[in-house]
Amino acid sequence: LLCEKDIHFKYNGESYHVVIADASIHPQGYAAFINYDGDIRGNTVLADIGNGTMNVAFMQNRKPLAGKIFTEQFGVYQCMKKARNEVMRNCQCEVPDHIIEEVFRKGTADIPERYIQAISEVAKDYVKQVFSKLREYGYNPDLMKLYVIGGGGCLIKNFAEYDADRVVII
């Protein structure tokens, strides 16, 4: 990124000259985290749980620690697929994704309880695995706060057992 600090180029017939003074590369989701107004001090972990991946960054006073940034192919979509299969297996019915998403977001939906139960069991297992993966990377809830962003935050909020003083859903 800083190989060429002095750049000349043309765009729409106009000539431009740009000097790059400095550049930083931060984990996905960092912008949402850094703009969070809450009191963020000391050792923290940022987990950005998106559709396809979970990005994890260990931080010290809001700054990512070099060598402590990880990406797992373990996003909400993996949970969605398992929930869809579980409903099919238990209820012999295909449930549209938007209903599963509603259960993920709200913890419930206007469907029979057996469907909610099947989806919820998968979601509970998924969030247990999320916390397990975080611990594998070095997350210790006694020593660090966890900040969760992305769609997976709804799953944590609705289906995980956690200390709300130590886990913040942004």
List PLM regions with ranges.
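Short beta-strand scaffold segments in enzyme catalytic cores
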Residues: 54-58
